[in-house]
Structure formats: structure tokens, C-alpha cells
């Protein structure tokens, strides 16, 4: 039987850093207001790079770390809600840029759950026996879809990318998964809405900026996501104590605080870096994963159990328990 494992991690963020104090110069806010409510202190904002540029940098790092030539890749999946364009896909641009001529490539649109959804799909591709290895990348330039006059959203988001190289393994590393969607709550978090613009349409103009009902999303995360995480831990057969770390979508520190209490696990097991990057949607979990390997908290030697959990627009939420 064929399984898959995460063998490389990488991340990349734009050089431009915007602090809370910087934002206070262009809108009615302050460092204290943002930090106390979200835990965010700064974020990286792209000035010239597109989403594909960030994803390409991650792909190049993953290949360099692995020693593989790009032609050894079988697939590339990019999770994003801020692609360069509707087509070609961001993944197709990555494929062309790195010369992965044997890989099929496509984008995954599942908002802040996108990386988890894409990773679950990639695991199944390799487990089928038809494919040996591929890249799963979360990449966003959310700065281009934000209304910078709306402080309820503008202070939250940042740009960045992270990803993993997934390849075949004789040992099982993906131990449990749970993926969910509730489209009935979809209007709680929206972006990129398009008007009907044909000569025959009677469509109304719509707001295409990212819009969010913050209270609804907070309640959804604490209620539905915590319930799903508790269920997947039970599904895995692991005791809570056997989980080394939980890497949740980096939306808000208060969500992590509440989640730890709701699930009944030590807060220190919930890794975080939103203070440095803000909410980077599909990129938040792989950036956190890569940084945690970089700083030595995670080893990639098969000795640790981690839980990855994303939640956001759709509404979508999903969790994986992985041995790394």
C-alpha cells in the first residue's frame, strides 16, 4: 500500500512590512486597538509581486531542498483566493516558471481552508499509486482584494506563501482527516463577486472587495471548528496528549485562546505567528508549518504528531492529523 509524507517545507513573504502604526496613518485605528483585538502587530504587503511570484519562490525553495529536478514532479496544487487571473491558473504559472513539464497543475479555491483541502487531495493522489510526488502551496496577495478604507478588514490581512513537497512513503503519515462545507453560511465571508455584464443581462453592481461578518465567523470557528477538531482527534485513535502541536489558521489570537479552552488542550500547543503576518488565508498554515520547522519546534523526522486545521470562506473548515 502506498502512503504519502511531507518531506520539505518552505515559505516566502514580500519584503514590505506594514506595522499597525503605519495603518494608523491612513485610517482611524491604532496599534493598541488592532493588537488587543486580534494579536496582529504587522503584516507583509506586496508592492510588485503577484500571487504567482510568491508561489514560485516557494516552489523553488522546495525543489532546492529536495534535490529533485522540476521534471520529477507529478502535480502542483496552489490554494488561493487571490490569483493573478481567473486563467491561466496560478499553479499553471508556477509549473511553467520552474519547468515542471511532467506535472499537471490547478488551483484550489477554498479560502482559509484551501491548503488543508489541497493537502488532503494530494495525499489521495499519491495514495492512488498513480503519482509519486507533487507540490502543495498556499499563496495569497490579499492586499489587492481589500478595501483599504474599511478598518474592519484592512487591519487583518497580509500577503505571503508557504508550501510543502509531498511524496510517496511506505509508512502512513496522514492519520485522520475531516473536511466540511456549509454553503448556507457563505455570505458571512465574501470577495470577488462579479456583476452580470453581457448586453443581455439585468445584473446589479456588487461590491467585489473582501467583506466579512466578524462576529459570525468568530462564532462559527469556536462552535463548528472546535467540534470537528475534537472529533478528528477521537477518529485518529490518538490521545490528546499525543498531539505535539496544533497549527490552526492564523485568523485571530482570541480564536486560538477560545479554541484551546473549548477543546481542552494546553494553549502552548497552539502555535502562532499571526503577530508577524496577519491573516494570510490559504498561506497561513504552510507559513506557520515552515517557520516551525525552521525554528526547530517541528523536526520532519517522523517523530511528531501535529494537527492542521483551516477555516474560513465558503464556509469551509477542515483538519488533518499528520505524523511528520
Curated annotation (Swiss-Prot):
Catalytic activity: malonyl-[ACP] + acetyl-CoA + H(+) = 3-oxobutanoyl-[ACP] + CO2 + CoA
UniProt keyword Acyltransferase, yes or no: yes
Positions of the catalytic residues: 112, 249, 279
Alphabetical UniProt keywords: Acyltransferase, Cytoplasm, Fatty acid biosynthesis, Fatty acid metabolism, Lipid biosynthesis, Lipid metabolism, Multifunctional enzyme, Transferase
Domain of life from the UniProt record: Bacteria
One Gene Ontology cellular component annotation held by this UniProt entry: cytoplasm
Intracellular or extracellular location(s): Cytoplasm
Pathway field: Lipid metabolism; fatty acid biosynthesis
Enzyme class: transferase
Signal peptide bounds: none
GO molecular function: 3-oxoacyl-[acyl-carrier-protein] synthase activity; beta-ketoacyl-acyl-carrier-protein synthase III activity
EC identifiers of the protein: 2.3.1.180
Description of its domains: The last Arg residue of the ACP-binding site is essential for the weak association between ACP/AcpP and FabH.
Subunit structure: Homodimer.
UniProt record similarity statement: Belongs to the thiolase-like superfamily. FabH family.
Role according to the record: Catalyzes the condensation reaction of fatty acid synthesis by the addition to an acyl acceptor of two carbons from malonyl-ACP. Catalyzes the first condensation reaction which initiates fatty acid synthesis and may therefore play a role in governing the total rate of fatty acid production. Possesses both acetoacetyl-ACP synthase and acetyl transacylase activities. Its substrate specificity determines the biosynthesis of branched-chain and/or straight-chain of fatty acids.
Annotated protein name in UniProt: Beta-ketoacyl-[acyl-carrier-protein] synthase III
Source organism of the structure: Streptococcus equi subsp. equi (strain 4047)
Gene (name only): fabH
Amino acid at each position: 500500500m502506498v502512503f504519502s509524507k511531507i518531506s520539505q517545507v518552505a515559505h516566502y513573504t514580500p519584503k514590505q512590512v506594514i506595522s499597525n502604526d503605519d495603518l494608523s496613518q491612513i485610517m482611524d485605528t491604532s496599534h493598541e486597538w488592532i493588537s488587543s483585538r486580534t494579536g496582529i502587530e504587522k503584516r507583509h504587503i506586496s508592492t510588485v509581486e503577484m500571487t504567482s511570484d510568491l508561489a514560485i519562490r516557494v516552489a523553488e525553495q522546495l525543489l532546492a531542498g529536495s534535490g529533485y529536478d522540476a521534471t520529477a514532479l507529478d502535480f502542483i496544487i496552489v490554494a488561493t483566493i487571490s490569483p493573478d487571473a481567473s486563467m491561466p491558473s496560478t499553479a499553471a504559472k508556477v509549473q511553467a516558471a520552474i519547468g515542471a513539464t511532467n506535472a499537471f497543475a490547478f488551483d484550489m479555491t477554498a479560502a482559509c481552508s484551501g491548503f488543508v483541502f489541497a493537502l488532503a487531495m494530494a495525499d489521495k493522489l499519491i495514495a492512488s499509486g498513480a503519482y509519486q510526488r507533487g507540490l502543495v502551496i498556499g499563496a495569497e496577495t490579499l492586499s489587492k482584494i481589500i478595501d483599504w478604507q474599511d478598518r474592519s478588514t484592512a487591519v487583518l490581512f497580509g500577503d505571503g506563501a508557504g508550501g510543502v513537497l509531498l511524496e510517496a512513503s511506505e509508512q502512513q503519515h496522514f492519520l485522520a482527516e475531516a473536511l466540511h462545507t456549509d454553503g448556507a453560511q457563505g455570505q458571512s465571508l465574501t470577495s470577488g463577486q462579479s456583476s452580470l455584464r453581457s448586453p443581455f443581462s439585468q445584473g446589479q453592481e456588487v461590491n467585489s472587495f473582501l467583506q466579512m461578518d466578524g462576529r459570525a465567523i468568530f462564532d462559527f470557528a469556536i462552535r463548528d471548528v472546535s467540534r470537528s477538531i475534537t472529533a478528528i482527534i477521537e477518529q485518529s485513535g490518538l490521545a490528546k496528549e499525543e498531539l505535539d502541536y496544533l497549527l490552526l489558521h492564523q485568523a485571530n489570537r482570541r480564536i486560538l485562546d477560545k479554541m484551546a479552552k473549548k477543546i481542552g488542550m494546553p494553549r502552548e500547543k497552539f502555535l502562532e505567528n499571526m503577530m508577524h503576518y496577519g491573516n494570510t488565508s490559504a498561506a497561513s498554515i504552510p507559513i506557520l508549518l515552515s517557520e516551525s520547522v525552521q525554528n526547530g519546534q517541528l523536526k520532519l523526522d517522523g517523530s511528531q504528531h501535529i494537527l492542521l486545521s483551516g477555516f474560513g470562506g465558503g464556509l469551509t473548515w477542515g483538519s488533518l492529523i499528520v505524523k511528520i
